[in-house]
């Protein structure tokens, strides 16, 4: 089941239930070094979730639901760390577009949860 409550087929493994706020600093770098293919699948799972849920990256997904807990925008850092530490079986430009959307467009969201609350004030 996708983030839009529809059934989807993917060409890669799909992962869900991410606590990005807790894991983006160190765990992602470690798993990218140890398991780059699986980490690439995790990165693309975030991208697919964003595409299906409003265009913005999620930050804390539980059972395919963006919970909206915690502050900040950890997923772009997670994606950058994954790439820097070896998870690269995807087009990084695609991910960069999603990162920029969340950083530059007020109202960017994931299942109605704003990617960067207060962005309009900046």
Stretches found by the model and what they are:
Residues 1-8, 37-62:
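Active-site-surrounding "flap" and adjacent substrate/cofactor-binding loops of secreted or lumenal enzymes
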Residues 11, 25-28, 60-65:
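Short acidic, glycine/Ser/Thr-rich loop/turn "cap" segments at secondary-structure junctions
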Residues 11-20, 64-72:
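Solvent-exposed loop and edge beta-strand segments that line ligand/cofactor-binding
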Residues 13-16, 46, 79, 99:
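Generic structural hydrophobic/aromatic packing signal, biased to beta-strands
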Residues 16-40, 77-86:
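Alpha-helical support elements that line or immediately flank enzyme active sites
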Residues 52-122:
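Active-site cavity-forming subdomains of large catalytic enzyme subunits
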């Amino acid at each position: 089941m996708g983030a839009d409550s529809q059934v989807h087929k993917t060409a890669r493994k799909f992962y869900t239930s991410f606590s990005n706020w807790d894991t983006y600093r160190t765990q992602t770098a470690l798993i990218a070094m140890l398991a780059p293919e699986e980490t690439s699948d995790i990165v693309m799972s975030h991208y697919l979730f964003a595409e299906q849920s409003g265009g913005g990256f999620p930050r804390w997904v539980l059972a395919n639901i963006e919970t909206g807990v915690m502050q900040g925008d950890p997923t772009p850092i997670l994606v950058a760390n994954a790439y820097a530490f070896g998870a690269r079986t995807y087009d990084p430009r695609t991910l960069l577009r999603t990162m920029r959307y969340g950083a530059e467009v007020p109202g960017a969201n994931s299942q109605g949860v704003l990617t960067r609350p207060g962005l309009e004030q900046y």
